[in-house]
A protein has these predicted regions:
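Alpha-helical transmembrane segments of multi-pass membrane transport proteins
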Residues: 1-169
Length: 169
């Protein structure tokens, strides 16, 4: 609802919702496959209902979910840090910019591909609807901030961050 209220009204908006939600979910779960499994069953039917082909919707969901391996807290970063004896906080910091760039690039590619498509759009949300959607999503959006901020700030270790996430969630 949050993502759709901000970008659902533009052409290709549901593709942007797919990318935005996948990036947020990946930032929470740390796993690309978990992102696709959790969101694919919801987003792909929604996209096909407004005119996307099933193949396009599935490909976009898989690609957006693949960003999860880069966006902190990535499970791959945790595994690599333990094998290579590298700070997981440093790896997380190194993944922020590439993850954001990949997300923005997928946004741009989605907009370019759907620019001439005749897809159904969601009516534009009012300012009040956007504020309500933000209020509803606020605590969920704060989870990555709390977890990553705690790790980067030295407040807790990645293992303790997992416990905080379990309690917070």
């Amino acid at each position: 609802k949050f993502a759709q209220s901000f970008v659902g009204h533009i052409n290709g908006g549901l593709a942007l919702v797919c990318v935005l939600v996948a990036c947020f979910f990946a930032a929470i779960s740390g796993s690309g496959p978990a992102t696709v499994a959790a969101l694919g069953g919801i987003i792909i039917p929604a996209m096909t209902s407004v005119g996307y082909s099933k193949g396009d919707a599935s490909a976009l969901m898989a690609t957006a979910g693949g960003i999860g391996i880069i966006i902190p807290p990535s499970i791959s970063f945790v595994v690599y840090s333990s094998i290579a004896n590298v700070s997981v906080g440093t790896l997380f910091m190194a993944g922020i910019i590439p993850g954001l760039l990949m997300g923005f690039s997928l946004f741009a590619a989605s907009m370019w591909v759907t620019r001439k498509a005749k897809l159904d759009r969601v009516p534009k949300a009012t300012a009040g609807e956007r504020i309500d959607a933000f209020k509803d999503a606020f605590w969920g959006l704060m989870m990555p901030v709390i977890i990553l901020g705690g790790i980067y700030g030295g407040i807790f270790t990645p293992t303790e961050a997992a416990a905080v996430a379990a309690i917070y969630g």
